Amino acid sequence: QAEEKFLTEQKSIMKQYGLENVKMAYSCPICKDEGYKNGQMCKCLKKEISNILMKDSGFENLENFANATKTSNNLSPYYKKMQEWCHTDFKKNLLLLSGQTGVGKTYLTRCMANELIERGLIVKMSTAFKMTQDFKSFHKSHNEELLNQYLDCQVLFIDDLGTEPLYKDITLEYLYLIINERKMRKLPTVITTNLDISQIRETYDERIYSRIVDR
């Protein structure tokens, strides 16, 4: 109804100024810059939301797989596999990318995030540190938007798990909430970390460990 009302008002204004025969130039030819088409959120609006979420987390500048193939690092053999994953139905909805600092994990996830945004998905990418600060803010303010950005995005990237402070009654509790809720809703989560499997088990409780390593 809102969509129809908008179109009616637009036509009325155009007619008022004698512009009913003038063709509008739209940024998005699919939804004609309305953000929705046939009651569904358009790809252009999803992209704009993803860009806002990325900017909020400090991940404005993404990479792409076309350039990645020209960049040599320890994860180069995985580029094609991860690019293919970006176009699947995400049956495996939690990916753990573990490795030492400097092997290219963040670069790879920037490529993946860009690929998914271009596919038309709402993507959120955050460092574990920034996410934990949002947990802390939510714990004090109960502003649900602070958690919903992690719960509701179609694909979530958590970068550098293990570098975040472990606040009592906050870090582990909310991290479990995010990972478990997304897993139940079959929403994919991609995690990068410098920790190996044994270190993950030492750092986090059994509930988080079992979901991260997908036991």
Question: Where would I find each of the regions flagged by the language model?
Answer:
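Pre-Walker A (pre-P-loop) alpha-helix and adjacent loop at the N terminus of AAA/AAA+ ATPase modules
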Residues: 59-95
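Hydrophobic residues in beta-strands of the RecA-like P-loop NTPase core, especially within AAA+ ATPase
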Residues: 158-159
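Interdomain "pre-motor" coupling segment immediately N-terminal to P-loop NTPase/helicase cores
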Residues: 15-59
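Loop/turn-to-beta-strand initiation segments
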Residues: 93, 121-122, 152-155, 185-191
